């Protein structure tokens, strides 16, 4: 279901497949992508159909906001990076192109959706159900949370359900024959019984020696390997909500006061409504109610919202901020049992009825209020300290000491680092950009406050900078020595292992110095703890007799391993396990087909992307 994809998106679960992402984008961007404006310069053209720059910016801004809410600090920290923004814009335009290709494909196939199909999709969607039954209150709440009306969501379904038909059609066209499942399972769950003789690389390296002449010769022959990137040494202060919140205490008095001042926030109402397309129809129904008509009967007969209308207009229990403000304001002005005059909400007209109203007790919401008060105190304290630190960093621009004192934090200092090994506390794209690219930090002055997440600010100062250059022989000596020792050790171990394999293959009873086999172990691809070792073992031919096969492989530590492969057992699964494996295998194949569909549509399409527009930064487009 499309709404499930939307629900997953708002809960930080992104669809793994391209078509899933495309379906999601209908909800993210609504239908604006198809209401093309002839006055707009294009962002892309797909078989002559224009994706306008305004539609692209709308989709980009919506995706930006959703990801910022979903990913929090991690996203905000990246969002100032030009490389990240360019990649995000490229991703958005590609999704819009894929969406347009599928829209055209739907049109080509003449797929359509009836009103009954839309209604069935809504009432059978598990996201709108409570205990297996459709719940209109849940339905309305989810639409409100996603800034959608019932009509708007129906329009989205009308456009998106054909895409799901295509997706399901592609998926259902793929099948796997039992023999294919059986063969794949036999390999994937195959057991290989082997004994290992491991020759330690670290131990062998410790035995090796390297002369100064060898080091010098290698250095002179491999100058390009010793190019050292630009390095910096910095001081910085780190102000975050975490270090502020530790010292914040919320009293019962503050909680009680907040509850009294914001009682409406903790009020829940049982509401009903009747929805109309225009004011005239709403006024006619209002007159009927004034003359004594039953509210539920009028809702069933006349409400544009057919889902709630079938239940007499019932919307269930609704908390604050779950419905449009105009709707909630109208309800707030009513007494229990009263209905409103027609009100305009997003272009439709509603008559609102308050059926019941009750407040949650202070005890029930105490923990929630404590969090709200604590957050409010933290925000106030954070912004105050951030401003003080910013002012002091500007006034005393060549030291962070006064700024740190104002913020109540310590000045931290790094060792030298390059762009490739930035310390964790500074590893944010906008901080890295400031350190290595900013004119301010290039001359040793304090940076402006850098926002790296919600309530998280860093101010940085570059103490010293080392330009890019080739390491001296002395600087490179340790690395070269280690490399040459490893090279010698690997050659020695591989030679020893190959000799052992030759001798053991000729006579399994031979005793080879330094080759000590472990007890028999079992290896499977399904439990692959060391991919390098396991893949090496599975590269060995299957023994055709009871005689072991010997081969040299390596493990993830770089050790050389002599393998004695004793036996290969084909994997066997129960009917239930085989069925589960078949489903996993099928999903993998279906995923490949879905990607191939998009690739096929792209290959036969004429696609033109306005690269100069897509690759320019946000500020240039304001």
UniProtKB/Swiss-Prot annotation:
Question: What membrane topology does the UniProt entry give?
Answer: Single-pass type II membrane protein
Q: Which Pfam families match?
A: Rotamase_2 (PF13145), SurA_N_3 (PF13624)
> InterPro entries under this entry?
PPIase_dom_sf, PPIase_PpiC, PPIase_PpiC_CS, PpiD_chaperone, Trigger_fact/SurA_dom_sf
Topology check: give the Periplasmic ranges: 38-622
Key word Membrane present: yes
Q: Name one GO biological process term.
A: chaperone-mediated protein folding
Its main subcellular localisation, reduced to a broad class, is: membrane
Q: Which residues lie on this side of the membrane: Cytoplasmic?
A: 1-16
GO CC, one annotated term: plasma membrane
What is known about what this protein does? Chaperone that functions as a gatekeeper on the periplasmic side of the SecYEG translocon. Facilitates the translocation of precursor proteins across SecYEG by interacting with the translocating substrate. Also plays a role in the release of newly synthesized secreted proteins at the periplasmic exit site of the Sec translocon.
For this chain, the family text in UniProt reads: Belongs to the PpiD chaperone family.
What quaternary arrangement does the UniProt entry report? Answer: Interacts with the SecYEG translocon. Binds to the lateral gate of SecY. Forms a complex with YfgM.
Q: What is this protein called?
A: Periplasmic chaperone PpiD
Q: Which gene encodes it?
A: ppiD
């Amino acid at each position: 279901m499309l709404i499930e994809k939307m629900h997953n998106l708002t809960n930080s679960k992104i669809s793994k497949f391209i078509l899933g992402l495309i379906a999601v984008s209908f909800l993210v961007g609504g239908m604006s992508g198809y209401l093309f404006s002839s006055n707009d310069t294009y962002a892309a053209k797909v078989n002559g159909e224009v994706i306008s720059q305004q539609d692209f910016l709308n989709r980009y801004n919506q995706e930006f906001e959703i990801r910022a809410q979903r990913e929090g600090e991690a996203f905000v920290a990246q969002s100032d990076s030009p490389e990240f923004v360019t990649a995000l814009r490229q991703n958005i335009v590609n999704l819009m192109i894929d969406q347009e290709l599928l829209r055209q494909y739907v049109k080509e196939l003449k797929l359509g959706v009836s009103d009954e199909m839309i209604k069935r999709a809504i009432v059978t969607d598990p996201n709108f159900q409570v205990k297996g039954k459709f719940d209109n209150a849940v339905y309305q709440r989810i639409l409100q949370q996603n800034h959608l009306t019932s009509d708007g969501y129906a329009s989205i379904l009308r456009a998106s359900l054909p895409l799901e038909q295509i997706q399901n059609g592609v998926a259902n066209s793929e099948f796997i024959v039992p023999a294919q499942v059986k063969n794949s399972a036999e390999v994937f769950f195959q057991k290989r019984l082997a004994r290992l003789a491991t020759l330690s690389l670290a131990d062998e390296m410790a035995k090796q020696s390297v002369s100064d002449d060898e080091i010098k010769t290698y250095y002179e022959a491999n100058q390009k390997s010793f190019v050292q990137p630009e390095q910096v040494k910095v001081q910085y202060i780190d102000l975050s909500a975490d270090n502020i919140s530790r010292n914040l205490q919320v009293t019962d008095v503050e909680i009680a006061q907040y509850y009294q001042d914001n009682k409406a926030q903790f009020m829940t109402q049982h509401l009903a409504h009747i929805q109309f397309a225009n004011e005239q129809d709403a006024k006619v129904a209002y007159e009927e109610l004034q003359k004594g008509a039953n509210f539920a009967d009028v809702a069933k007969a006349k409400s544009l919202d057919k889902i709630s209308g079938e239940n007499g207009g019932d919307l269930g229990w609704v908390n604050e901020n779950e419905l449009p403000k105009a709707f909630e304001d109208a309800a707030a002005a009513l007494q229990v049992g009263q209905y409103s005059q027609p009100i305009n909400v997003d272009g439709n007209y509603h008559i609102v009825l308050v059926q019941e109203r009750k407040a949650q007790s202070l005890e029930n919401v105490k923990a929630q209020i404590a969090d709200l008060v604590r957050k409010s105190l933290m925000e106030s304290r954070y912004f105050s300290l951030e401003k003080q630190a910013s002012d002091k960093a500007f006034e005393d621009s060549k030291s962070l000491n006064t700024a740190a004192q104002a913020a109540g934090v310590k000045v931290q200092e790094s060792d030298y680092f390059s762009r490739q090994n930035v310390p964790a506390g500074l590893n944010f794209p906008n901080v890295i950009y400031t350190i290595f690219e900013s004119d301010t930090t290039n001359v040793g002055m304090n940076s402006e406050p850098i926002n790296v997440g919600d309530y998280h600010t860093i101010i940085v100062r570059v103490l010293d900078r080392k330009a890019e250059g080739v390491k001296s022989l002395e600087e490179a000596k340790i690395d070269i020595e280690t490399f040459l020792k490893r090279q010698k050790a690997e050659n020695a171990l591989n030679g020893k292992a190959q000799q052992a394999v030759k001798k053991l293959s000729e006579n399994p009873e031979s005793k080879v110095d330094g080759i000590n086999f472990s007890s028999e172990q079992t290896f499977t691809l399904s439990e692959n703890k060391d991919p390098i070792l396991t893949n090496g073992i599975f590269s060995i031919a299957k023994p055709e007799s009871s005689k072991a096969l010997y081969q040299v492989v390596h493990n993830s530590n770089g050790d050389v391993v002599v393998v004695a492969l004793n036996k290969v057992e084909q994997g066997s699964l129960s009917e239930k396990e085989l069925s589960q494996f078949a489903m996993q295998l099928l999903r993998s194949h279906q995923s490949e087909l879905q990607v191939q569909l998009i690739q096929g549509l792209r290959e036969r399409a004429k696609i033109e992307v306005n690269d100069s527009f897509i690759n320019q930064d946000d500020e240039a487009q304001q």
